[in-house]
UniProtKB/Swiss-Prot annotation:
Gene3D superfamilies: Leucine Aminopeptidase, subunit E, domain 1, Zn peptidases. Presumably involved in the processing and regular turnover of intracellular proteins. Catalyzes the removal of unsubstituted N-terminal amino acids from various peptides. It comes from Polaromonas naphthalenivorans (strain CJ2). It catalyses: Release of an N-terminal amino acid, Xaa-|-Yaa-, in which Xaa is preferably Leu, but may be other amino acids including Pro although not Arg or Lys, and Yaa may be Pro. Amino acid amides and methyl esters are also readily hydrolyzed, but rates on arylamides are exceedingly low; Release of an N-terminal amino acid, preferentially leucine, but not glutamic or aspartic acids. GO terms for cellular component: cytoplasm. This is Probable cytosol aminopeptidase. Residues 487-510 are annotated as: Disordered. The gene is pepA. Mn(2+) 1 binds at D259, D336, E338. It is found in: Cytoplasm. One of its GO terms (biological process) is proteolysis.
Length: 510
């Protein structure tokens, strides 16, 4: 979908030709004598329209308005969250139709236009319009081709617009790779996606194969991949936005491209959803896509340990002991607790980079789903400042997380008679004990763990990846920029140039 940011008064909006005009109506709408303001005032007065977020009123062929269809949508207090709810409702109504190719989203009625509200509106448009088509033989063409975002002025809107377009591209890439079936998203293919990102401004990609991984001593990662014929890959992405001497923020994404559970095999029901076990990796790819678009001034490294967890004839067995890259030995009591095994070696690798902070992202535990459901991701950290930064980013990006405990007492269950540590500690507090396991490998740097098992995808009729937590990660990274000297801007090719315009109208595609 193409997005265009355009300065339009309410009067000019009435003259804008479009298949649909979406108008967000907040509490305390200011009066006006243009056709749009009159229509909204009459609808509210008659009781046909509520300003509660998401409430809709459709009108067709309104006198004085050039658009074929007008959707008045309640936006409540006009907060970013209310704006998102309103736009989701409007886009849902448009998606049900067949003839909308060009739409105008009017934000002029909002009392104070915050950049965050503009971002929320555009991301909601992009996410609602997204449809997975990669493995369909006859994919339906997207109906909606252009969305004009109408504002009173660019001063407050431009920053939110630029950020939203970059974020939308990142979320879409994360969704695309997470939604792909496992045979279309193998570790090798995932590495190929990372190499494509390496063609974008400031991004470099390195892919390590089995021999290089073995040479590094990543025994835990190698152990997980023993049961599959698909070769494992260790993917390293580097975004270079600051001086080389500046320590990077490291993002680690769990990349289990399909998880059967191994010898500790999962139940057959809903096992197809285990293609989503690489959503952590997908979120790292998506975040790097957004970084390439926005070009912030900091250094970021992405690490993706990618492999399958299969019950082949060489698969690890319950009771096996393996040696991790750190030198610590691990007793594998449950082969379905494989995510922490690939992550622990990635954490040890991250220490070599002398990072300013490390954040790992993983669909790690069903226990986190039980604790937090699908609303908030679980946040664990050994550093207060890092945890606070991530929590703030979650709130500001509408991609929230919740801080979970890391008391040392939780580690008692990880003790082993046969190794330095066991990979599981029983059912009680499973999300916390998994994080305690990872913490053993993050003693030398500020570290946080995001358990996205409940937020990375949806089941049922709406089955599919959510693209979370790309929004959280991007806001977190942008918040780190002020402390880092920026490198000189990199000129992008026309296909990848960030959408930053000083003219009254800016066009871009997400």
């Amino acid at each position: 979908m193409d997005f265009e940011l355009k300065t339009l008064t309410r009067t000019l909006i009435c003259n804008e030709k479009a298949d649909a005009l979406i108008v967000l109506i907040p509490e305390g709408l200011t009066a006006g004598d243009d056709a749009l303001s009159v229509l909204a005032a009459l609808a509210i007065k008659s009781g046909d329209l509520e300003v509660k977020p998401g409430k809709l009123l459709n009108a067709y062929r309104v006198t004085g308005i050039a658009a074929t269809r007008v959707l008045l949508v309640g936006a409540g207090d006009a907060s970013p969250k209310s704006v998102r709810t309103a736009v989701n409702a409007a886009m849902g109504a448009l998606k049900a139709g067949n003839n909308v190719q060009r739409a105008v989203l009017c934000l002029n009625a909002l009392p104070t236009l915050q950049p965050e509200a503009v971002r929320a509106a555009i991301v909601a448009c992009s996410e609602t319009a997204y449809a997975y088509t990669t493995t369909k033989s006859k994919p339906a063409a997207a109906k909606l081709q252009q969305m004009v975002v109408a504002v009173d002025g660019l001063a407050n809107a431009q920053a939110g617009f630029d950020k939203a377009v970059g974020l939308a591209k990142g979320i879409e890439l994360a969704k695309e790779w997470a939604n792909r079936p496992a045979n279309h998203a193998t570790p090798t293919l995932l590495a190929g996606a990372a190499k494509e990102l390496g063609k974008l401004p400031r991004i470099k990609t390195e892919v390590l194969g089995p021999k290089e991984i073995e040479k590094l001593g990543m025994g835990a990662f190698l152990a997980v991949a023993q049961g599959t014929a698909e070769p494992l890959r260790f993917i390293v992405l580097r975004y270079e936005g600051a001086a080389k001497a500046e320590a990077p923020v490291v993002l680690i994404g769990k990349g289990i491209t399909f998880d059967t559970g191994g010898i500790s095999i999962k139940p057959a029901a809903e096992m197809d959803e285990m293609k989503f076990d690489m959503c952590g990796a997908a979120s790292v790819l998506g975040t790097f896509r957004a970084l390439a678009e926005l070009q912030p001034g900091l250094n970021v490294v992405g690490l993706i340990p990618a492999c399958e967890n299969m019950p082949g004839d060489r698969a690890i067995k319950p009771g096996d002991v393996v040696t991790s890259m750190s030198g610590q030995t691990i007793e594998i009591l449950n082969t379905d607790a494989e995510g922490r095994l690939v992550l622990c070696d990635a954490l040890t690798y991250a220490a070599r980079l002398k990072p300013r902070a490390v954040v790992d992202i993983a669909t790690l535990t069903g226990a986190c789903v039980v604790a937090l459901g699908g609303v908030r991701s679980g946040l664990f950290s050994n550093n207060e400042a890092l945890a606070e930064s991530l929590a703030r980013a979650g709130e500001s990006s509408l991609d929230p997380c919740w801080r979970m405990p890391l008391d040392d007492d939780y580690a008692e269950g990880l003790k082993s008679n046969f190794a330095d540590v066991a990979n599981v500690a029983g059912r009680a507090g499973g999300a916390v004990t998994a994080a305690k396991f990872l913490q053993r490998f993050a003693a030398d740097f500020a570290w946080a763990h995001l358990d996205i098992a409940g937020t990375a995808w949806k089941s049922g009729a709406a089955k599919g990846a959510t693209g979370r937590p790309v929004a959280l990660l991007l806001d977190f990274l942008l918040g780190q920029v002020q402390a880092v000297p920026a490198a000189q801007p990199v000129k992008a090719s026309p296909k990848t140039r960030p959408a930053r315009k000083s003219t009254p109208a800016a066009k871009t595609r997400a």
